[in-house]
């Protein structure tokens, strides 16, 4: 690959065709992440008949990369896309395992506020149900519920620097408003996440203790102490750091006596999230912090992430969330060059631990676990990003649907997408 990019070769060596359905890749160096889906080896293919006619420097801005045009691969081909609304799939007549049993699949974006009534009416066959509405949907009789731990989490992050495009790396600002680790830890200990999960999400969402999720059972440290609700400890941390209430108004000032106001941003989601955002503000006020909602309201999701990715200087703290994929390597999200390192926090210790996780030494299982535990403890101690809610995803499946499970399209699945079928022309109601 290197010789090809440097113009020393007109082809990429190390790619071997085994048969019509198998390709073997030869690497100069092996990394532990290669043992996992998505870890260092792309889980997608690029259609040569499309990209051969587009200059490489234009790939990133091309319609096929930006999603304006789509080429499908698998049991179904993409028939049409309505941006932000729906995707229609049709059976791939040439699928190597045989023609799918369904002629067409229509995926639509539906408001969480409407999905319960839509499923009750039989308007959709499969839907992920909003945890906050569990009481409203739990007794539906025309569906079967399947559940699995969702490999994703919500978090509170602190804006600690910027992404330097010219250098292609994150640069931490030692003078950032949230630079004091005691301030960050205090904001974590102020939150009663388990109570929020119970009251707002019916216990289907709950707190976690680490940025490595239980989903990664081989390296997750279940014994690590997380940021459990402890407002007294939060107050003590702030006192020790020099954030004190000097004028008796119940709110703490900066160490130099100036007014401390923290701007907090959150994306617009559902009613439960709106309640949670307001509760965050109240919990932080209880420990003496003046935290104000940036713009006075939550922000539409696309606009929110644009502000985060461009390091809006007016945002000090933000609540967001993401899926974790199948490779737990923290360098993917928190490394020096990781664009998704939205807190922009980098230090030598963290970088060194991540190098160990990505080293050949980590092929040793015991060493791998040791390195991951070390990074989890480091991340908790530095509190650049605090995990809040994880949970179980509940999927409602209409009773006419056959051969569906929560692990479909993964190696653990007993069902494959092309086998999915329905037993009647109309949905159960």
Kindly give the residue locations of the regions a language model identified.
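Surface-exposed binding/hinge segments that line
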Residues: 1-53
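Detector for C-terminal structural segments
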Residues: 93, 188-220, 272, 276-282, ...
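Ligand/substrate-recognition segments at binding pockets and active sites
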Residues: 83, 244-321, 393
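Gly/Pro-rich hinge or "lid" segments in bacterial periplasmic/extracellular proteins
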Residues: 39-100, 104, 231, 236
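A bilobed periplasmic-binding-protein/Venus flytrap-type ligand-binding module shared by bacterial periplasmic
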Residues: 90-93, 152-182, 199, 392
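Ligand-site clamp/hinge motif
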Residues: 67, 91-137, 290
């Amino acid at each position: 690959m290197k010789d090809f990019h440097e113009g020393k070769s007109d082809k990429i060596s190390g790619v071997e065709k085994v048969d019509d359905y198998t390709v073997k890749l030869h690497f100069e160096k092996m990394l532990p992440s290669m043992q996992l889906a998505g870890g260092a080896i792309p889980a997608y293919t690029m259609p040569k008949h499309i990209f051969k006619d587009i200059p490489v420097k234009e790939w990133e801005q091309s319609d096929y990369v930006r999603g304006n045009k789509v080429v499908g691969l698998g049991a179904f081909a993409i028939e049409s896309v309505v941006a932000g609304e729906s995707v229609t799939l049709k059976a791939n007549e040439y699928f190597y395992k045989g023609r799918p049993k369904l002629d067409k699949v229509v995926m639509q974006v539906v408001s969480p506020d409407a999905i319960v009534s839509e499923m009750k009416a039989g308007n959709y066959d499969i839907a992920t149900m909003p945890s906050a509405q569990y009481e409203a949907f739990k007794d539906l009789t025309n569906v079967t519920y399947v559940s699995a731990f969702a490999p994703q989490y919500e978090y509170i992050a602190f804006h600690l620097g910027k992404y330097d495009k010219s250098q292609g790396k994150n640069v931490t600002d030692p003078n950032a408003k949230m630079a004091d680790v005691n301030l960050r830890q205090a904001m974590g200990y102020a939150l009663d996440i388990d109570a929020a999960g119970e009251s707002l999400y019916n216990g289907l969402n709950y707190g976690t203790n680490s940025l490595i999720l239980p989903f990664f059972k081989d390296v997750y440290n279940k014994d690590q102490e997380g940021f459990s609700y402890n407002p007294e400890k939060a107050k003590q941390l702030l006192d020790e750091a020099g954030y004190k209430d000097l004028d008796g108004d119940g709110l703490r000032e900066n160490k130099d006596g100036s007014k401390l106001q923290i701007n907090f941003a959150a994306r617009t989601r559902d009613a439960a999230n709106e309640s949670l955002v307001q509760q965050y503000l109240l919990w932080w006020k209880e420990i003496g912090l003046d935290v104000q909602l940036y713009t006075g309201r939550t922000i539409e999701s696309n606009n929110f992430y644009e502000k985060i990715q461009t390091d809006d200087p007016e945002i000090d703290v933000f609540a967001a969330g993401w899926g974790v994929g199948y490779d737990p390597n923290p360098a993917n999200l928190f490394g020096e060059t990781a664009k998704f390192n939205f807190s922009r926090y980098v230090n030598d210790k963290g970088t060194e631990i991540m190098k160990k996780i990505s080293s050949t030494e980590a092929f040793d299982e015991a060493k791998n676990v040791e390195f991951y535990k070390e990074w989890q403890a480091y991340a908790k101690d530095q509190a650049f990003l605090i995990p809040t809610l994880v949970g179980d995803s509940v999927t409602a499946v209409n009773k006419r649907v056959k051969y569906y499970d929560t692990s479909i399209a993964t190696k653990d699945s007993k069902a494959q997408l092309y086998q999915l079928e329905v037993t009647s022309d109309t949905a159960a109601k």
